[in-house]
Curated annotation (Swiss-Prot):
One of its GO terms (molecular function) is NADPH-hemoprotein reductase activity. FMN binds at residues 59-64, 110-113, 156-165, 191. This is NADPH--cytochrome P450 reductase. The lineage of its organism: Eukaryota, Fungi, Dikarya, Ascomycota, Taphrinomycotina. The chain crosses the membrane at residues 6-26. It comes from Schizosaccharomyces pombe (strain 972 / ATCC 24843).
Amino acid sequence: MKTYEYVLLVIILILSLCYFIYNNFLNKPKAPERRVVATDSIVELMEAEKLTAAVFFGSQTGTAEDFAYRFSTEAKANFNLTNMVFDLENYDLTDLDNFDRSKLLVFFLATYGEGEPTDNAEAFLQLLEGDDTVFSSGKGIEDTPFEGIRYAIFGLGNHTYEYYNAMAKKVDAAMTRLGATRVGNLGLGDDAAGMLEEDYLQWKDDTLPEIGKLFHLQEVHKEYNPMFEVIEKPEISNTSSTVFLGEPSRQQLKGNVASKAPRSQANPFFSSPVRSLELFKSGSRNCLHLELDIADSGMRYQTGDYASICPMNPSQAVDDLLEVLGLKEKRDTVIIVKPIDTLDKAPVLSPTTYDTVFRYYYEICGIVSRQLLSFIAPFAPTPESKQELEKLGNDYDYFKKNVVDLHLNLAQVLRRVSPDAPFTKLPFSMLLENMAHMKPRYYSISSSSVVHPDKVHVTAVVDKKEWTDKNHIFYGLTTNYLLAHCRHMHGEKIPHPNGLEYTLEGPRKNWTGKIPMFVKKSTFRLAPPDVPIIMVGPGTGVAPFRGFVMERANLASKGVKVAKTLLFYGCQYSDKDFLYKEEWQQYKDVLKDSFELITAFSREQDHKIYVQHRLLEHSDTIAKLVEEGAAFYICGDADHMAKDVVNALASILTTVDVDGMKAVKALRDDNRFFEDTW
């Protein structure tokens, strides 16, 4: 072949290659891409995205957000209701008066502290309740600017607080006052009664059909339609620097977190415990004291604030769930999770792994929801397991007896209904859509910020509950995680007495010996030193009061005159579970007669004696201090102790002319009555 023929052949090959590339890649029509309009106006965004409903959440720990997404998913699946979930603080809602009257607003609102809005809902409440609020059309509150707007609302609260579900009630009242009309009942979820899930299901089952009627939407019961695509990427190593292995944010993964960025669950401080003690070990009960270094965190706390601990799930729980799903061999397989509708938010940071999702990002140790079991039933491996899951999902009494009362998690229920066959057909996306995300746990800081500005002290009883007749043990998530750190810190060969194991080294061994945490502000504040205080805190409820007394002792040591500081403390035995027993005497030595500790040991006599009984025994002292302007504090169990203490206080304050409960309310209104209960 001659030279020019070679050249001609090469040219033909090049042209053919170019044509192939152009025809198959460059000239390939692109799939239509749906983009969310960049605006902070809900009115504009809903119009641009052709949405029928906007679902808002006001959430402190993420629970209200989880419910909002669950509602959004079910509304789309069962009623074809086009909607999107929004964080209240991310949007300018002054133009809500221009909201399309043919559309719907839905609110999921948690109440925080003493009837306060969550941080991300504070501005929204101020907008609705402000006397000088002017909306975009120029209308004020008195002009009923929301006339014709329809809304639905579900609140998350705790009935043991006086201001039960105050946020939902306030927003509901404000929306009505502004002219809006509520669809369905005002949903009031009660976390204290353990009925939050059931309260939500009842409200949702009543409200969704009402919404369907409003928009002429027929309820459809179609097969499961995933919101997210879960794509396995076996070609990507789980050691790749791009894979999330438990990092709480993209900035954390990349290592470029701004030094002054606010601390939160997405940007926790990794604190080194500098001291740890087990204050008592009594049978199956033990109590921890941990001191966490925050010197380089950029955080500052005030006495009475919370230490927010970001836990992880124990390895045993992760293994159990992976095994029952048939994913144990794939635990380290890299997966990418993508929303099918680009309006939706990805539920986890990805790429990640199956192991990581269950270890760090989701709550897998808590009681499984009844609704999730009913969703899983069609994917059960056997007819028998399907039938059992359907019964658990549809019969609340049966579910309560066999799941709630035993504190069973998802893996434990699935293993019981199908001991031999794994749930290999269960879509992973269904779990991502319906399980709760991992949330921080709040612990009252047990130190004084004046005495220990660079250290946060945490006091916690390790949670363990055993049903010997059922061969089942429930372990508290965060307290057992902290116990593992405590044992690790002391270098014990058996790191955990309950046999639980944790990857304390964290992702890529970057957390070794450190606990992810941040400080959460509280309204539980120590009164000025010249104000008498009465504190009631049995068990670990004494934690914030240790900080209070510590601070007053510090002030007294500097010559500051301190008013009466009266502490009522209770536990089971004086020689077994008396927290900080020697320490109280040290404070007494400094504070002298201004400090008094009154104890109640419930099991040292034939009849039980609790702190409320001691209050009644010291009625005259308490009444006198209240008359002198004392502040009254309660910390601890909400279901029984707090109620009994309030009743005792009301009894003490009752006179011929004064109703005791009204007197307690007057203390609240005067900012002299504080509760921190759970």
